[in-house]
């Protein structure tokens, strides 16, 4: 994991396990865990993690706002229409080829959707390797992903 991923994981953990009232409080807790960052970086991280301030009674604190499954599906369909180059099964894996620079976005969306057949995604710049448990799981996953492709995608095959 890189520094940002490690920091994000710690922030998610702190938000879910403790009540954090302010950005300064979160920044101090990060520092106690050996991570020193600026307020601007923390603010960007909080936005990327969909952290929102909520009020319950007289208390305000931060929580992670979950993105709905429907929204992730819409996002996947949008990416498939605009950036999918190839979708192919290779034994218990699926190769998803994208326009340059977009494979990690596909991987993040697929991870967030928690498709049961997907064991892991490994993404580079323009290729996302989707690993499934076995060949049957890969076929089922391929069928699921095919529903998000534009109608014309498989017309030449």
From Swiss-Prot:
SUPFAM superfamilies: C-terminal domain of arginine repressor, Winged helix' DNA-binding domain. GO terms for molecular function: arginine binding; DNA binding; DNA-binding transcription factor activity. InterPro entries: Arg_repress, Arg_repress_C, Arg_repress_C_sf, Arg_repress_DNA-bd, WH-like_DNA-bd_sf, WH_DNA-bd_sf. It comes from the Bacteria. One of its GO terms (cellular component) is cytoplasm. The keyword Transcription regulation applies. Pfam families: Arg_repressor, Arg_repressor_C. It is found in: Cytoplasm. Signal peptide: none annotated. The keyword Ribosomal protein does not apply. Keywords: Amino-acid biosynthesis, Arginine biosynthesis, Cytoplasm, DNA-binding, Repressor, Transcription, Transcription regulation. One of its GO terms (biological process) is L-arginine biosynthetic process. Its main location: cytoplasm. Pathway: Amino-acid biosynthesis; L-arginine biosynthesis [regulation]. HAMAP family: Arg_repressor. Belongs to the ArgR family. Regulates arginine biosynthesis genes. This is Arginine repressor. It comes from Streptococcus pyogenes serotype M49 (strain NZ131). The gene is argR.
């Amino acid at each position: 994991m890189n520094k940002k991923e490690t920091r994000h994981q710690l922030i998610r953990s702190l938000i879910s396990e403790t009540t954090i009232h302010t950005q300064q409080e979160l920044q101090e807790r990060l520092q106690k865990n050996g991570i020193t960052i600026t307020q601007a970086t923390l603010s960007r991280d909080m936005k990327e993690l969909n952290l929102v301030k909520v009020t319950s009674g007289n208390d305000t604190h931060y929580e992670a706002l979950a993105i709905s499954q429907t929204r992730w599906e819409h996002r996947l369909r949008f990416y498939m229409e605009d950036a999918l180059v190839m979708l192919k099964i290779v034994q218990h894996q699926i190769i998803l080829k994208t326009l340059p620079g977009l494979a990690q976005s596909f991987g993040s969306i697929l991870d967030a959707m928690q498709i049961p057949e997907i064991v892991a995604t490994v993404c580079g710049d323009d290729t996302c390797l989707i690993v499934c448990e076995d060949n049957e799981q890969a076929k089922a996953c391929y069928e699921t992903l095919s529903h998000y492709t534009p109608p014309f995608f498989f017309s030449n095959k």
